[in-house]
Amino acid sequence: MRIILILLIFSVNFSYPLYAKIASVIGNPHTQEIYFKVNKDTKNYPASLTKIMTLYIIFDELEKKRLNLNDRVYFSKYATYTQPSKLGIAENDFITVNELIDSLIVKSANDAAIAIAEKISGNEKNFVIKMNAYAKELNMKNTNFANPHGLPNRSNLSTAHDIFKLSSKIIIDFPEYLNRFGKTNTDINGKNYKTHNTLLNKYDHYIGLKTGYTRKSGFQISLLSINEDDYLLGIYFGGNSAKERNNKINFLMNKFRHKDVSKNKENKKLIVKNEKENNKYYKVQTSSFKKIKKSKMHITLLKNKIKILRSFEHEIKKNGRYFISYINVDDHRTAKNLCNEIKLNQLDCLIKTS
């Protein structure tokens, strides 16, 4: 009955954009369980949601050490000719990879998308080939990318379900960058840019991810909500205005969020905080073996299966007859997030304080 009522509310007073079709998916990014769907496999123009794939590739290049956050990204003549939204960087001028990431997320800069495509793959065409190869790996069956920014192109097509898959992967594979999506403004080359996602200023449980708009696509969003251990991801295509898009996605997210959340603007909570809570330190216990060799093998297994664990300190301590392996963290939320990631891989963990 609740789904029927939501579908009725979802359809009332909608005048469809000229080319776009309303589509939405709401679900859990970790389990891929879908709670709500409308036209989830209908092909639409993804507009700037295309940049989520561009960002995924950037993060992957950083992880593989083929890029560094301090690397310079130069703007070619071709990049400077890109249509707005753009930074307007002059030909042969540059920004860093670190700045470019913020420019894609906050400003949604199309010229920056071309510049990074050229840096990674030599030219836009080769980068698009890479984008589609990644899409195939991510099982985005109804997606074809034609550029790295999402400006109008008849061949640049995707679906709400495929963008849900892509957004889920960027959340799972690169959680260390999630706080970047929650930024409401950024400074680049002496200019301050404000986010297009005004929901970030109103609700402290939303963490990005990306908005998009062209005349043919309508207003779109990929939106992540985090409340303690409750992750909810919403995709919405085809709004007639930013206000309508925000109202509709917020309505749907509220219906399917499992826990109540505060609307405190002043204390925006990010996925991982590096603050100490009451001077406590936390340990995530990951294994207990009689032989130290097995403990070491288990740590290697964890690091291979769960990328985020590679950036944390692991230690093994003997307790009686057993060798106990731990991950040391500074706060309870980080401990819970890591433990949840471990459990999602059908492995055990235990949180302890010290």
Language model segments and positions:
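Short, flexible loop/turn motifs enriched in small residues
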Residues: 16-22, 215-218
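Extracytoplasmic
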Residues: 161-164, 168-282, 290-354
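Sec-dependent N-terminal signal peptides
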Residues: 3-14
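A mature extracytoplasmic/lumenal domain signature
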Residues: 50, 77-79, 91-93, 118-120, ...
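Local beta-strand/beta-hairpin segments that build beta-sheet-rich folds
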Residues: 35, 285-287
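Active-site-adjacent loops and short helices of periplasmic peptidoglycan-processing enzymes
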Residues: 18-159, 171
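Terminal, positively biased "leader/anchor" segments
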Residues: 2-3, 136, 285
